[in-house]
A protein has these predicted regions:
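Residue-level signal for pocket-adjacent positions within structured domains
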Residues: 31, 37, 79, 155, ...
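Catalytic strand-loop segment that frames the active site of acyl-thioester-processing enzymes
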Residues: 2-61
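Generic structural detector for well-ordered beta-strands
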Residues: 28-32, 91, 143
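Residue-identity detector for glutamine
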Residues: 32, 66, 74-75, 119-120, ...
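N-terminal first-folded block
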Residues: 36-40, 45-95
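Hydrophobic, well-ordered secondary-structure segments
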Residues: 7-8, 14-16, 21, 26, ...
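Generic detector of contiguous secondary-structure segments
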Residues: 43-45, 49, 101-104, 118
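HotDog/MaoC-like acyl-thioester-processing domains
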Residues: 2-19, 92-101, 108-174
Length: 174
C-alpha cells in the first residue's frame, strides 16, 4: 500500500503523517533549532523523539488514533487498549544539523499476541540524493506492549485486538 504525499492537499492532516511505501512507513521531518545542542547538531535524545513521532504518524496512517484510545480509557472503557513502549535500543551512527531533511522509517519486525517489535531508521536525505542511499543517523529497535486497564487501577498486558493486529500485519509486512 502506497500513499504518495504529492497526491494529498497541503492542508490535510494526512499529509503530515507521512506515507506507507511497501512495508515501511515513511515520516519526513526537518531539524529545527529546538532539536539541536550548543554545537548545532541534533541532541541525542531527540532521535528518540523523532522515532516516537514516526510511530504515532504510522498508527494514524493505519486509522489508529491513540487519542481515541486515551479518551476511551479516561471514560472507563475496560475494553480500550494502549500501545506503550517497553524498551528502546538505540545506535547513534552519525549526526546532522539545523535544517537537515530527515526521514523516519518504521518497519514491523515481529507481531506477537500482546506485543510487537519495530525497527526505526532515521536517515539524513540531502537534495539530489536517492532516498534509499540517505545517510543512516540512528537505528532504533523498539518493543511495544499492548496494555489495558485492570481492576486494581493499574494496567496489564492484554492481547492485541484482532482488527489492530490485522491492520499492522497488512500494512507493514511484505
Amino acid at each position: 500500500m502506497t500513499t504518495d504525499p504529492r497526491n494529498l492537499s497541503r492542508g490535510t492532516a494526512a499529509a503530515l503523517d507521512g506515507w506507507i511505501d511497501g512495508a515501511v512507513h515513511i515520516y519526513p521531518l526537518r531539524v529545527q533549532y529546538e532539536d539541536t545542542d550548543a554545537g548545532g547538531i541534533i541532541y541525542h535524545s531527540n532521535y528518540v523523539s523523532f522515532a516516537e513521532r514516526g510511530r504515532s504518524a504510522c498508527l494514524r496512517c493505519l486509522g489508529i488514533r491513540q487519542e481515541d484510545a486515551l479518551a476511551a480509557l479516561q471514560q472507563g472503557d475496560r475494553e480500550a487498549v494502549m500501545l506503550v513502549v517497553r524498551r528502546v535500543e538505540a545506535d547513534f551512527l552519525m549526526t546532522a544539523g539545523l535544517g537537515a531533511e530527515l526521514r523516519v522509517e518504521t518497519a514491523l519486525l515481529k507481531l506477537g499476541g500482546a506485543s510487537m517489535k519495530l525497527q526505526q531508521i532515521i536517515r539524513h536525505v540531502e537534495e539530489g540524493m536517492k532516498i534509499e542511499n540517505g545517510h543512516i543517523l540512528a537505528r532504533l529497535l523498539v518493543d511495544i506492549g499492548c496494555v489495558a486497564p485492570h481492576v486494581d487501577g493499574g494496567k496489564r498486558p492484554r492481547r492485541m485486538p484482532s482488527d489492530l493486529a490485522e491492520r499492522l500485519r497488512q500494512a507493514l509486512t511484505d
